[in-house]
Amino acid sequence: MSNRAGQAAIIVAAMVAVAVGVRIDAQSGSTASGAGSLRQTAYVKASNPHMGDHFGNGGTLLGDSVALSGDGLTMAVGAPNEGSGAKTINGNQDDTSVYAAGAVYVYARRSTTSPWAQQAYVKASNPMAGAEFGHVVALSADGNTMAVSAYFEASATKGINGNQNDDSIPQAGAVYVFTRRGSMWSQQAYIKASNTGEAGTDGNFGDGDQFGFSASLSDDGNTLAVGANADDSNATGINGNQNDNSMQSAGAAYIFVRNGTAWTQQAYVKSPNTAANVQFGYSVALSADGNTFAVSAFDEGGSSRTVINGASGPFPAGRNGTGAIYVYTRSGSTWTLQSYLKASNAEVNDSLGVIVSISDDGNTVAGGILDEDCTAAGVNPSAPCDNDMKEDTSVGAAVVFVRQGVQWAQQAYFKASNPGKEDWFGSRLQISGDGNTLAVSAQLEDSAAQGINGKQDDDSAQEAGAVYLFGRVGTQWTQRFYVKASNNEAFDEFGSSVALSRDGRTMAVGARGEDSSAKGIDGNQGDNSVKEAGAVYVFTYNPSAAGRTPATK
């Protein structure tokens, strides 16, 4: 489990307009015609970039700070380290008095061929130093409801719309819900855990529960899932004892529902095999209707290498840190565990579930395995592969599971076409709403290539980052594109966040370490005067475009 303390970045690519008609062969990394075209259509920066704001992502393995609406017409980007003391909507962006209070920037466009414009600058109603508002952003399908987490927010209050001004529990965490009417945004709710944790003394997990470490919205925006990876209860299952604090960083997830404009907590969800430090709730994902819920525990230590359907647990232990994904379903207001998902080659410290994503129908779940050690390439590689290296290599992998009826099974296992040690392939990923496009990032990948399908075997730009775009036809997955930033440089960490529209035709990618001082849309990419300001790159995929050789930037 090497390099977990590294840093991440988000970049959404811009204005390169590179058209490509090649597909990268799943086994060899060679290319074949017929994948359509992918082009970079926007380069997006904060309207107030500052050094270390990390526009698009707060840090390595921390949060999904970029979100797209289902139609791809609204985009939200978090900058968790932004330092303005402004409150709520469109306040003073030039203030820098509250370090790492965090901010979110909302962008909109009229159509998928129209230019992007910033619509709102969004701040917490109670900005606090170090709260990191914007750590996670989530959007409803129409983009009119937005959830934003501040997982280091320090209020001790519980439930909905409580006292925001208390700061007695560092890292307690909070989630804020905003709604849009026309083009106007307003805050609808301030949401806290029903068992906001106790103040600790060690400055890390021993402080608060980190409610809001992960979050997800249903398509209609009426169901919200929130992970608190440092919750300390020893409860198991649904709605157990929330007030116990004997199991450090076991983790939990919370389900909230909205009726009209009022939010209430529906469920408190714990792993069936709760254990200390497994971090259940590290990543969460809801189906479109909100009735299927995937949640990970990326340090879970189960020994299984198969999916276990229909069992309530607990599950056998024996491989520390392999990680697991749990799938729950809802009938009415009642939640039930449906399946326990494990990778077919699970080994100690692989970390399955560092990120999870789910299709709209809930029948496809993708999970990242960033510390997996196998050096094979492609989809379902046939070459022998050692995933139990004496030295942890963190090459990384991803896996897709599918559901037929109520039965889950592993469908595909993904490796980069250019696997490299400590690339962290699978550190971020997202599956499209239709389930047929999968974007997987390797945010520490080292190639100096720029644009689409460039040279993959170059290692001269350390931790520049890359994104790999896969497509599914029937049950078969292939890699379509190898994607790099248009201004790719070392330590930019392109791929620290990824987001896809429902049809997979719009992709946004964050690079938290990008250094340009540009503001707004399509500014100067070549400037490097504001270190780790961050950027986001937007790409457009056209599956029917005629293939042609990639343009050279």
Language-model regions: role of each:
Residues 1-10:
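Bacterial N-terminal signal peptides that target proteins for export
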Residues 10-19:
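Bacterial N-terminal signal peptides
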Residues 19-25:
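Juxtamembrane cytosolic interface motif at the C-terminal end of transmembrane helices
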Residues 25-553:
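Conserved beta-strand/short-helix segments
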